[in-house]
């Protein structure tokens, strides 16, 4: 499938795309609609999205974040050291590249911003997209297992 639209104006919407391999690359384009507030890529999620890592694109605060749920300490909306300010606007196509090498995660937003993180606790699960109080269109999704 070449395009997915996810979102709800009144809450949370998600799309699970299947098992995430321990060494892989996820590449896609995304357009955030005018009312979009938060877009997420979830990684190593359980079937209910109750335990997962999240790459977040916050259109209100203009930042890319990395988080896990449930959180270990404090109740910050993301891991404080894993926040990158980004230029992001609605109705513009952006490209994301996500590379996973076991516990190492590299995220590239629109070939301008990068973020590195570790995923030490949740070793396996699914991946997909989520949107809150808005709508996003995902296009040109490529998923590749990486071989050594």
Task: Describe the residue ranges of each PLM region.
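Extracellular glycan-recognition regions
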Residues: 1-148
């Amino acid at each position: 499938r070449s395009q997915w639209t996810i979102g709800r104006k009144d809450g949370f919407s998600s799309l699970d795309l299947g098992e995430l391999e321990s060494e892989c690359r996820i590449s896609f384009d995304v357009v955030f609609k005018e009312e979009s507030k938060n877009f997420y890529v979830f990684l190593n999620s359980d079937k209910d999205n109750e335990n997962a890592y999240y790459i977040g694109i916050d259109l209100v605060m203009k930042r890319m974040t990395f988080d896990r749920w449930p959180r270990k300490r404090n109740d910050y909306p993301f891991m404080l050291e894993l926040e990158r300010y980004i230029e992001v606007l609605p109705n513009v196509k952006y490209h994301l590249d996500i590379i996973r090498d076991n516990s190492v995660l590299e995220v590239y937003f629109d070939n301008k911003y990068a973020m590195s993180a570790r995923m030490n606790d949740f070793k396996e699960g699914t991946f997909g997209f989520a949107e809150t109080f808005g709508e996003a269109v995902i296009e040109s999704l490529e998923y590749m297992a990486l071989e050594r």
